[in-house]
Amino acid sequence: MARIAGVDIPNDKRVVISLTYVYGIGLATSKKILAAAGISEDVRVKDLTSDQEDAIRREVDAIKVEGDLRREVNLNIKRLMEIGSYRGIRHRRGLPVRGQNTKNNARTRKGKAVAIAGKKK
């Protein structure tokens, strides 16, 4: 397994897919990285030379990934909560942030349904 940005990426998969195991790199970013490094998308990770791995590492180092990206996202959410914006309040209350209805659904965000006493028929 090759190690890129502190993540072990699978050997048997194509490089373009393996790079998506790094937090912050999706398929589109993965393709851009490989194009900039001059590596084919069809190559398997186990077939990469050390020079190619170094080229990929250099390209990934220029992008904000893993811990830095997670920290930035968490700080952005914390900032929204501190300034008291609508989105920050929704984060604080554990409700959907992007305008979804909450009358019937939103169970993923709200958690397990709480039974109301005296509601039996």
Curated annotation (Swiss-Prot):
It comes from the Bacteria. Gene3D superfamilies: 1.10.8.50, 30s ribosomal protein s13, domain 2. The keyword Protease does not apply. The keyword Acetylation does not apply. Residues 106-121 have a biased composition (Basic residues). GO terms for cellular component: cytosol; small ribosomal subunit. InterPro entries: Rbsml_uS13_C, Ribosomal_uS13, Ribosomal_uS13-like_H2TH, Ribosomal_uS13_bac-type, Ribosomal_uS13_CS. One of its GO terms (biological process) is translation. Residues 96-121 are annotated as: Disordered. GO terms for molecular function: rRNA binding; structural constituent of ribosome; tRNA binding. Keywords: Ribonucleoprotein, Ribosomal protein, RNA-binding, rRNA-binding, tRNA-binding. Part of the 30S ribosomal subunit. Forms a loose heterodimer with protein S19. Forms two bridges to the 50S subunit in the 70S ribosome. Belongs to the universal ribosomal protein uS13 family. Located at the top of the head of the 30S subunit, it contacts several helices of the 16S rRNA. In the 70S ribosome it contacts the 23S rRNA (bridge B1a) and protein L5 of the 50S subunit (bridge B1b), connecting the 2 subunits; these bridges are implicated in subunit movement. Contacts the tRNAs in the A and P-sites. This is Small ribosomal subunit protein uS13. It comes from Streptococcus suis (strain 05ZYH33). The lineage of its organism: Bacteria, Bacillati, Bacillota, Bacilli, Lactobacillales. The gene is rpsM.
